[in-house]
Amino acid sequence: MELNTSNKNNRKSAVISGSHFSDLSGFYEEVSDVFMNDEDWKVGTLDGFDDILYGFEGEIIWKEAEKSKEDLGFEATKVFYQNKIRQGKPFNKELIQQKLEELVDGIGQTLFEILIEIIKSHSNIKLILE
């Protein structure tokens, strides 16, 4: 866990360490520690992760990204979708089923790919995978 604010132009540098987690809930803990150390709440959803990136400007260094890519890959994503389908409301079961089918067909995104997409959707953030 590391957040460095001493870079040029007051840009920040945040480090997400893949060695600190092996599943999505561990990822949420890691990013909560990195980005929200002084807050009363923790990230617990993909939308919540997206929300905490607003206002952050700088670079995110994701160490051991290959480990995270495997940990948050096909199997973890399949279980993630199956749990949402099983839970039902408030989730749109048809949409989640479609996402699961796309994943199984090899055209859907894994959790790792979704997280990368979320980070890259913020133009003020540079992502570095190590």
Stretches found by the model and what they are:
Residues 1-130:
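Positively charged, polar, low-complexity stretches
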